[in-house]
From Swiss-Prot:
Disrupted-gene phenotype: Mice are neonatal lethal and show vascular defects in both the embryo and the placenta.
Major localization listed first in the record, in broad terms: cytoplasm
UniProt protein name: Cullin-7
Protein family according to the UniProt entry: Belongs to the cullin family.
Alphabetized GO MF terms: ubiquitin ligase complex scaffold activity; ubiquitin protein ligase binding
Subunit architecture: Component of the 3M complex, composed of core components CUL7, CCDC8 and OBSL1. Component of the Cul7-RING(FBXW8) complex consisting of CUL7, RBX1, SKP1 and FBXW8. Within the Cul7-RING(FBXW8) complex interacts with FBXW8 and RBX1, but not with SKP1. Interacts with CUL1 (via the C-terminal domain); the interaction seems to be mediated by FBXW8; it is likely specific to FBXW8, but not other F-box proteins.
Encoding gene, per UniProt annotation: Cul7
Chain intervals with Basic and acidic residues compositional bias: 1321-1337
GO biological process entries: epithelial to mesenchymal transition; Golgi organization; microtubule cytoskeleton organization; mitotic cytokinesis; negative regulation of insulin receptor signaling pathway; placenta development; positive regulation of dendrite morphogenesis; protein ubiquitination
Record localization: Cytoplasm; Cytoplasm, Cytoskeleton, Microtubule organizing center, Centrosome; Cytoplasm, Perinuclear region; Golgi apparatus
Length: 1689
């Protein structure tokens, strides 16, 4: 099963060194399906943790709360089950129950009630005075009672809440401190009580007005203590914003409200119905109302959290002038803020006829330094992104641009770019066509975060995870989630406006019942009505709610289309076509205000029209008597649009030369602090500018003094800003300022003391921010889990926005030198800066001895390296590093931890040294130990350090993957349990998996913003759900059969019946195919590493892929399990077939058909995947391996025979020949399984024999080479290939022999010419006679030469002579000699018959053939003497009876063998001849001679065999034509048919004996070497040496082996493979080439002797040859009417 079972509990692996363990049952509830569900706390344990179930677990430990069903509890949490198998319910008994007597407890409750009344009375009496001592004593006694847990119930009275509220709002510090003591005592019992107390206090009306800084901090500290143990989460490496206390308190209120509602939803029915005095009555409602209230509260919390985290400001563009919870929709649609920059000097793409023409224009016009804009989406770059053109070359893509959106260069195509020109040429214009084009390409994104959201359309592969069909009726209405998101804004309207919405819904929906406000959540609202509501809502909502509306998903889906063209909303494109004219008219009527300060006026002008409020504020504050009404009006505008105010404060971060601007701004801010309404402005968002101004060494003293006055005034007014200054490090900055100016700055010391006192509060604020954010993330993960479990939609407003912000930055990469503090080098430090200048043409070059060069990085605190890359260049030759070692240490003196060792290839340019470190190393040292080609010094082109992403994505990804992995592994375990109990439930697995994967697909498309986030979820789902299920269903059970194997076996069994679509077998097969398709094809689109995964770019841009791994395709474990299961099924199927049918005559065709069926089934089940086809072949091979040796030899002989028959049958041509070729092809595909098996040697033996007979009897053809090319791996010794190669060598010898004959002829002709001259001078008459004789000799020699010349053009044996060739031959010779072609073969490659079949040319061939043979023998001897080495033994020819001939008999051409040719030519001189005399002359074995006589005496043959009493064997004579008419002309094939061997005969047993003897030798040699083992090559050599010379089998065994006594290295390797499979030999994975002896073999080892005891050395090698004879004329034939035989070929 998946995971690990310890202490009978299931442990789920969550990551490297992490696993989850079920610890405790927290609560139970009734699920949506009516079945009970149980919340289990899973502890996250690291490697080495004990995890003992009896040990107590600290609740601060990292854990995950997971709701589980009965089946999941039964499969994963055995400890939670009772003896009867039922889940043990959680205990509700108090730990101190029974400790107090009921009477004593009643008396204490009475005392508490009286103490509460007394404290309230005393508190009212001392209002405005110093609290009396009795009041403090009363509160102290109440705190003591509150610490007793059994009395917790009495403190849930509402009067206690009122008492605490009065005490917290008291101006006296002691009373507030006592209230804190009582709250701590009440909340010390359990988290539920603590949460209820905090909730009840925070929900009081206007509590913020009654609480001062200390009281608020007391409640915040209590909340921090309450949430610290609930959601332990670390945000190390992520820069959290500074959140003021008032905003934190508001977040705490929202968070407490949400957690309370969530706790009520997760409670059982009894808890939901119980009344609680601590909480308001409006929250004690039913479940349906609770779900609505929870969704609305969660949406409000997300809205405020996004604003507090300043995610909207970080994601908005700099020119955006709005500050909202989310990036505002108006800021994107206002024409004056969303202008497109372009230059009118360059032509747009729309003015060209084609992309190619435009690409040429851009290529010729564009110059380095010009600005460009992207026109379409391309990999990482989106349409609308701008950048600076750098360079171009001939690569693909050709243009390199530095993009503003990514911060690095990226290569794109010419036609994708629009030229903007140099900066001075660019104008802010709007082009309608361009706007439409960019809108179509996605440049005008309407998603609130500027991070481009690219929905994942294929998280899993189609078409197997098919999305659900969209219901047309549902598409016409809003979903409940969309309606509730719209309802979120309706709830923010006034009472009258809500009633108007209800009336509108009543009119449109035509409901029979009368609607009221409480019935709105249950309505089904049409899309048209929702669009009308979206049209009216912007006019009624406040500014903050309006910006939230523009950011929600329902507005993005339905709002923009309906609002286009309506004048009621000016922010929609096209809504106000005369908007520019209206603005111009208003500007003409009301000229802009001018500031008295020129510096401030420049700031106002840079802000545009929105900056005019700053001028109004300056004028209102600058008058002698500040105009309070005008100032408040300006403050109200700045609260709605705070960008001008933030720009005013951030101007302090400008250059110190702007002294006038700084003083003006500080005086405005100083006056602004005096107004209470000004404290509502977001001062905290720009406080960093003040700290930067403090830290700047160039800041003027006057500016510093004014800044300190302002900060002192601000922190005195609200101590929250002192806390923020502490968080920003202002204390150290003020100390440095005091030290520089020697303490002459007024109020600086006081400001520093005030900031220092807030250290504890700063820590509290940071902890609260972390806890709230971590708690929200946990609640979001809980909602995702509930969404997975129930498949109910997530109905929380802004849920998608929150996830997008959490995932924002997952596709961003940062390569900046801010990850290290400094870089040190071993030599030439003046060039160290070249390592970080990002210029590949510069380099740092070392100077020193080899191996002493290093680069040291001093890392910034907390930076964990994600990737460290070294840039090198191959052109540096010997200066290029070859061996690099990376070490880490805590100090420069202790860099001794080796982190990685890298060998650098000479062709490398980027060398990854480190990836995904898990801890922080202060010092990283790169040591260059060796250079290429033995170089001394080294050159490094650059360093790139990729640190942790400064976003929340790594944290959220880790939590999302952990929860997802735990959920799906628990579910996979439960499903596996069902399958183990009933295999038939495996048929339902495809629908289960399909539903789960479709759910994740839909979730990713709606909520996950980019590819990496979707891939992280996809990879986790795959590893947690599919991988364990595949492992379980492919693991064999008690009967050694896996569940999937049983299912596949059933599929193969009913395959034929499944062709009927109406049968049950068809439905069954369909389910099996759907399951296998899903398991194989549903895979992650990108293989992602465990820590980070970035999509790999293509082509030129691949250099920016920092952390790409592997990886597409199925995980190796899944593929291995599936292929192993399929292999075992195929093996079992084929083993049954082989066992039952190996003796059948039609075994091979049936085997090929079975193989084809399995191959087709593999494609049906798993698609065209090579891994499963290979598994199918390996399964067939495993089945063959299980056969005994003789049966396997029989199988191999049958295949060799079948191939031989199909090759010979294909020669007949026509339809029958094509059918033979098709059968041959199917057989060749099936026989390929022999290639890795021991049986391949046996198959090669038989194939070699049949191929030799085929080549020598009918000749070679193109099919021989094609067959060998396809099944070549099945021949370990490559003997068939060598046989074909020897034919080519023989043809070359034949051509050389032809040249040799011509040379001999030329010499003879010269001699004849000299003789002729001498005879003519001496005797004229006798000279004439000599001349005729010489001409006769010349003609005879020339005939032989031409015959051989004619053979030079022949490439294949058995090819008929062409007409053109005949004409060429007749031109010189008139056919006086038959053509003789000699085929020289070697016994090393060709199977040669015994010596008794050797041909004696002197006695068996006619004289006219013997001459050619003698000439060839002389030629071969001379060629061998010239080409051979001195020490090499001389080769000699031995003529055999093998071969073929063409004999002319009257008008017929008889195709016969060499033996038949000799027999027919023998009858030219005799009318009849006895078989006995023929055998005596030829010395042929009787069976060979009778095999040759059979076809000659058949009905097609020319001979008759007559039996005579006195002549054994009969008499042969030429058949009389009158007795039996025969065809007079044409070709007649009389070559004896092929004879096949029997594997069960003596030869097969000899092969088995040889294998056993080789096994003995292998085992004996390995035994002698013991545990040291032996290299496989050395073992083969020793075995061959022992076979030739050493101790070998007894003489009887050797003689019984016959021709099988020869041994080759392939035979030895085959035996080694056999012994490895049987387990007799073993080898280690790290050294697979070394073999060891494992166990004794079962083969008895015989006594060994020499195979050739009397030989002093090896015999000289023999070379066998055969004949090919051809002739045109028959001058020696009889001229009578009797038919005679003449050798034609």
């Amino acid at each position: 099963m998946v995971g690990e079972l310890r202490y009978r509990e299931f442990r789920v692996p969550l990551g490297p060194g992490l696993h989850a363990y079920p610890d405790e049952l927290i609560r139970q509830r009734v699920g949506h399906n009516g079945h009970p569900e149980y919340q289990i706390r899973w502890l996250i344990l690291r490697r080495g943790d004990d995890g003992d179930r009896d040990s107590t677990v600290d609740c601060k430990a990292e854990h995950i709360l997971l709701w589980m069903s009965d089946d999941e509890i039964y499969a994963n949490c055995h400890k939670m089950l009772g003896e009867n198998g039922q889940v043990i319910a959680p205990s509700r008994e108090s730990t101190e129950a029974g400790a107090l007597d009921k009477s004593v407890l009643g008396e204490m409750e009475t005392d508490v009630k009286s103490l509460i009344q007394r404290a309230l009375r005393q508190l009212e009496e001392c209002v405005g005075t110093v609290p009396p001592a009795p009041l403090l004593h009363t509160v102290h006694v109440l705190s003591a009672y509150a610490s007793i847990e059994p009395l917790t119930g009495i403190f849930k009275d509402r009067r206690v809440v009122n008492l605490l509220m009065h005490m917290l709002s008291s101006p006296d510090y002691q009373i507030r401190w006592s209230a804190g003591r009582m709250i701590q005592a009440l909340s010390s019992h359990d988290a539920g009580t603590r949460t209820q107390i905090l909730l009840s206090l925070s929900q009081q009306e206007a509590i913020e007005k009654h609480l001062d800084f200390d009281s608020r901090c007391a409640l915040l500290a209590l909340f921090a203590q309450a949430t610290l143990t609930e959601h332990p989460m670390s945000f190390e490496g992520v820069q959290l914003p500074q959140v003021p206390g008032r905003l934190l308190f508001s977040l705490v209120k929202r968070y407490l409200h949400v957690t309370f509602l969530l706790d009520r939803l997760n409670g059982d029915a009894g808890d939901q119905g119980a009344q609680n005095n601590f909480i308001p009555e409006e929250l004690n409602v039913g479940r349906g109302r609770l779900e609505l209230e929870f969704s609305m509260a969660m949406g409000t919390l997300i809205s405020e959290l996004v604003q507090a985290m300043r995610w909207d400001g970080a994601s908005s563009r700099p020119e955006s002038s709005s500050s909202s919870t989310f990036q505002p929709r108006p800021a994107q649609f206002r024409p004056y803020t969303q202008r497109f920059r372009r230059s009118r000097r360059f032509r747009p793409r729309a003015s060209f006829a084609s992309f190619n023409t435009y690409a040429l224009y851009v290529r010729d016009t564009l110059r380095p330094g010009m600005r460009v804009r992207m026109l379409e989406n391309y990999e990482e770059i989106a349409a609308g992104d701008e950048g600076q053109f750098r360079q171009s070359n001939d690569g693909v893509p050709p243009a390199q641009v530095l993009w503003d959106s990514t911060g690095h260069t990226y290569w794109v195509h010419w036609h994708m770019l629009e030229i903007l020109g140099f900066e001075e040429d660019i104008e802010d214009v709007i082009d309608i066509e361009e706007l439409q084009e960019l809108g179509a390409n996605g440049a005008l994104s309407i998603v609130p975060p500027s991070q481009r959201w690219k929905p994942i359309t294929q998280l899993f592969a189609e078409p197997y995870v098919v999305p659900e069909e969209e219901d047309r009726e549902e598409s016409e209405n809003l979903t409940q989630a969309e309606w509730w998101e719209l309802l979120f804004f309706i709830r923010q309207l006034s009472e009258a406006e809500r009633l108007h919405i209800v009336d509108l819904l009543q009119d449109h929906l035509e409901e029979e019942r009368v609607l009221d406000y409480d019935m709105l959540p249950e309505l089904t609202v049409p899309v048209d009505l929702a669009q009308d509501l979206l049209l009216s809502l912007p006019q009624q909502l406040e500014d903050s709610a309006l910006r939230d509306l523009f950011s929600c998903s329902v507005y993005r889906k339905y709002g923009p289309e309906v609002l286009v063209g309506h004048l009621s909303y000016p922010f929609v494109p096209g809504a106000q076509p005369n908007l520019f004219g209206a603005n111009e008219e208003s500007e003409a009527k009301d000229p802009p205000l001018q500031s008295a300060s020129p510096a401030l006026q420049r700031l106002v002008e840079s802000l545009g029209p929105e900056g005019e409020v700053l001028v109004e504020l300056e004028q209102a504050l600058g008058s002698e008597a500040p105009q309070e009404t005008e100032v408040k009006s300006c403050l109200l505008q700045l609260q709605e649009q705070p960008q001008p105010f933030l720009a005013l404060m951030r101007s302090l971060d400008t250059s110190a030369s702007n002294k006038t601007l700084h003083l003006t701004v500080l005086r405005i801010l100083m006056q602004l602090v005096n107004f209470p309404e000004a404290l509502l402005l977001p001062w905290h968002e720009a406080m960093d500018a003040c700290v930067t101004c403090l830290r700047s060494p160039n800041t003027d003293r006057e500016v510093l003094q004014e800044l300190i006055f302002f900060l002192h005034r601000l922190t005195t007014t609200s101590r929250d800003y002192a806390v923020i200054l502490n968080q920003l490090g202002a204390r150290d900055a003020i100390s440095k300022v005091l030290e520089k100016h020697r303490g002459k700055l007024e109020l600086a010391q006081e400001l520093r003391d005030m900031v220092s006192k807030c250290e504890k509060h700063a820590h509290l604020y940071r902890k609260l921010t972390t806890n709230i954010l971590g708690g929200c993330i946990q609640m979001v993960l809980g909602q995702i889990e509930d969404h997975r479990r129930t498949h109910r939609p997530i109905q929380i407003p802004f849920f998608d926005v929150f996830l997008r912000y959490l995932c924002q930055g997952s596709s961003e990469e940062m390569k900046k030198n801010r990850y290290w503090e400094k870089v040190e080098v071993s030599s030439n430090p003046q060039r160290a800066s070249r390592l970080t200048d990002r210029n590949p043409k510069t380099y740092w070059e070392s100077s020193g001895r080899a191996g002493s060069h290093f680069i040291t990085l001093h890392m910034r605190p907390g930076v964990i390296i994600r990737q460290l890359t070294l840039l090198v260049a191959g052109e540096d030759s010997s200066y290029m590093p070859a061996w690099v070692v990376v070490c880490g240490g805590n100090s420069i003196k202790s860099v001794n931890k080796e982190l990685n060792t890298v060998n650098v290839m000479p062709s490398a340019s980027r060398v990854t040294l480190l990836e995904n470190l898990t801890r922080f190393w202060p010092i990283i040292q790169i040591r260059i130990k060796r250079c290429q080609q033995g170089g001394i010094n080294t050159r490094i082109r650059g360093l790139e350090v990729l640190g942790p992403k400064p976003t929340f994505w790594p944290v959220f990804r880790e939590q999302l993957c952990r929860h997802t992995r735990l959920f799906y592994m628990v579910r996979a375990q439960a499903w596996s349990q069902d399958i183990a109990e009933d295999r038939r439930s495996l048929l339902h697995l495809s629908s289960r998996l399909n539903g789960a994967l479709r759910h994740e697909q839909n979730f990713a498309e709606r909520f996950l913003p980019d590819m990496e986030a979707a891939q992280a979820l996809s990879k986790t789902c795959w590893e947690a759900l599919v991988s364990p299920l595949v492992q379980n269903i492919t693991s064999p059970d008690e009967d050694s059969t896996s569940s999937l194997g049983w299912l596949l076996d059933q599929y193969l069994g009913c395959r034929e019946a499944a062709y009927n679509p109406q049968s049950r077998a068809a439905a069954f097969s369909s389910r099996v195919r759907r399951l296998t398709h899903l398991l194989v094809h549903v895979e992650p689109r990108e293989a992602a590493p465990p820590v980070v995964a970035i999509p790999r770019s293509k082509g030129r841009n691949r250099i920016h892929d920092w952390s790409y791994l592997i990886t597409r395709g199925l995980p190796s474990s899944i593929m291995k399990n599936l292929t192993r299961c399929w292999r075992s099924v195929v093996e079992e199927q084929m083993n049954k077939f082989l066992t039952a049918s190996w003796k059948d005559d039609d075994f091979v065709p049936r085997y090929c058909e079975r193989y084809y069926v399995l191959q087709k089934s593999s494609s049906e089940l798993f698609g065209p995947r090579a891994a499963f086809l290979l598994a199918m072949r390996n399964g067939c091979a495993d089945a063959v391996l299980r056969l005994p040796f003789l049966r396997a030899a029989h199988v191999s002989e049958q295949f060799a025979r079948h191939i031989d028959q199909r090759i010979q049958g294909s020669r007949m041509g026509g339809a029958r020949g094509m059918e033979m070729l098709a059968q041959l092809q199917r057989c060749l595909e099936s026989v390929l399984i022999f290639s890795p098996l021991e049986i391949a040697t046996t198959f090669e033996h038989y194939y070699q024999h049949y191929m030799a007979d085929r080549l020598l009897s009918v000749g070679s053809s193109w099919l021989e080479g094609a067959v060998l090319e396809q099944i070549g791996p099945c021949f370990p010794s490559r003997l068939p290939q060598q046989m074909l190669q020897s034919l080519n060598v023989s043809e070359e010898l034949q051509r050389q022999f032809h040249v040799y004959q011509l040379q001999q002829l030329d010499q003879e002709l010269l001699k004849l010419e000299d003789t002729e001259k001498k005879i003519q001078v001496a005797h004229e008459d006798s000279g004439r006679e000599d001349k005729s004789k010489k001409e006769e000799a010349i003609g005879e020699a020339a005939a032989v030469a031409m015959a051989e010349e004619e053979d030079q053009g022949k490439k294949e044996e058995g090819e008929e002579e062409g007409e053109g060739e005949d004409e060429e031959e007749e031109r010189y010779y008139k056919g006086t000699m038959p053509e003789v072609c000699v085929l020289v073969v070697t016994p090393r490659f060709w199977p040669v018959a015994s010596v008794c079949q050797m041909l004696n040319p002197a006695t068996c061939l006619p004289a006219y053939l013997r001459g050619t043979i003698n000439h060839y023998t002389n030629f071969y001897s001379k060629s061998q003497s010239r080409s051979s080495l001195e020490k090499e033994p001389q080769r000699r020819l031995q003529w055999t009876w093998q071969g073929r001939a063409e004999v002319q008999f009257g008008g017929q051409i008889l195709h016969v063998s060499t033996v038949q040719m000799w027999l027919l030519l023998h009858l030219n001189n005799q009318k009849e001849v006895s078989v006995e005399s023929l055998q005596a002359i030829s010395e042929l074995p009787p069976d060979v001679l009778h095999r040759a006589i059979g076809p000659l005496t058949s009905s097609r043959g020319p001979l008759d065999l007559q039996e005579q009493k006195n002549v054994p064997g009969g008499v042969l004579k030429i058949r009389d034509d009158s007795e039996e008419p025969r065809p007079r002309r044409g070709n007649v094939w009389l070559i004896p048919p092929q004879t096949y061997l029997q594997a069960e005969a003596e030869e097969g047993r000899n092969m088995e004996k040889r294998r056993n003897l080789l096994n003995c030798l292998v085992v004996r040699i390995l035994k002698a070497h013991g545990d040291e083992g032996l290299h496989v090559d050395r073992l083969v050599y020793l075995v061959l040496e022992a076979w030739e010379k050493g101790p070998c089998p007894a003489r009887g065994l050797v003689s019984s082996l016959g021709r099988g006594a020869t041994c080759r290295s392939s035979d030895v390797l085959s035996c080694i493979l056999h012994l490895l499979v049987k387990g007799t030999l073993r080898r280690h994975d790290d050294r697979p080439q070394v073999l060891y002896y494992a166990v004794p073999v079962t083969v008895m080892e015989p006594h060994m002797e020499s195979l050739n005891p009397g030989s002093a050395g090896p015999n000289p090698p023999l070379t066998f040859h055969t004949l090919q004879i051809r002739s045109r004329g028959v001058p020696y034939a009889s001229c009578t009417d009797n038919h005679t035989f003449s050798t034609f070929r």
